[in-house]
Amino acid sequence: MSATLALTEQLIARASVTPDDQHCQQIMTERLAALGFECETIASHGVTNLWAVKRGTDGRDGKLLAFAGHTDVVPTGPLEQWTSPPFIPAHRDGKLYGRGAADMKTSLAAFVVASEEFVAAHPDHRGAIAFLITSDEEGPATDGTVKVVELLQARGERLDYCIVGEPTSTTELGDVVKNGRRGSMSGELVVKGVQGHIAYPHLAKNPIHLLAPALAELAAEQWDAGNEYFPPTTWQVSNLHAGTGATNVIPGHADLLFNFRFSTASTVEGLQARVHAILDKHGLEYTLKWSVSGLPFLTPRGELSGALEHAIRTETGITTELSTTGGTSDGRFIARICPQVIEFGPPNGSIHKIDEHIEVRFVDPLKNVYRRVLEQLIA
């Protein structure tokens, strides 16, 4: 069994359901400390975070490449539906099964073993290697990576490159990497009406009827056309509720929850202003509460993308696709302090599902790609 596969199994065996790290980071810390990493645990409200760094011969003047990821996993769902227990690593048909196998304990193990091999081969490496690991990525993500980033900002720490080990591949290792992500902004809209008897509508104001024309306009609006890297911004309703459940009462208010997934072609302020303009045009009496969970980020083609594409092509023969599709990730926080952030990891077809797994044939090539990037950028 390879070192990467063995460490992956060791991590899967820890039932680290968010935000409980279950000592996964301790396992990683022991391996990294043996290489000369300075390891720091940063705890926050039940969340465990790790910042570990090993400087090269150039000291703080050297380029720094960070590996970022999360030790927490999503809940298992019904245990009886799993073919084998989710926290007991199991091999079947060339696949390793277990919660976190794809998202993202294989990436974590590959980070560690790639670093071990790199340091052994290049003991006098010039640049620095760092690890930014959290147990709060699958949860609220309020005490994880964002807290470490804030701390590093306060210290003036500089990151030059960051690889986030998210499972970005689709069918083959390296067929897709993410060089950016859309932003996410949600709104909680309450449209006020006047409750009344449904037989006397002239004595009431139906907020559903009042909202409907504005809702149709919002749904039809083209917010932007996207750009070279991003598809057009989307606006979607996730929840709509009004009424008491009775059939003879006009509701007093209508509640609407919606979400923007937006690109670098739009801004938070611009989208908010356009929503308010549409609501105001329809004469609605309303309240609207906004929450921004992440801004869009983009890493244009450059040193990191070039090194990663070359490493993937050398290791697998695949020409990779740069993509910005999908949901948000912790990359949105890291981009605040790092100009080049790219996500790359194993195929994602089984993530968050019953019988999550990774094909064993991808495990060591994943580690090799990470090591090749280290060799290209900081040796």
From Swiss-Prot:
Catalytic reaction list: N-succinyl-(2S,6S)-2,6-diaminopimelate + H2O = (2S,6S)-2,6-diaminopimelate + succinate
GO biological process: diaminopimelate biosynthetic process; L-arginine biosynthetic process; lysine biosynthetic process via diaminopimelate
Binding positions for Zn(2+) 1 per the UniProt entry: 70, 103, 166
Cysteine disulfide links: none
EC number: 3.5.1.18
Top-rank lineage group of the source organism: Bacteria
HAMAP family in alphabetical order: DapE
Record text on subunit structure and interactions: Homodimer.
Protein's name according to its UniProt entry: Succinyl-diaminopimelate desuccinylase
UniProt gene name: dapE
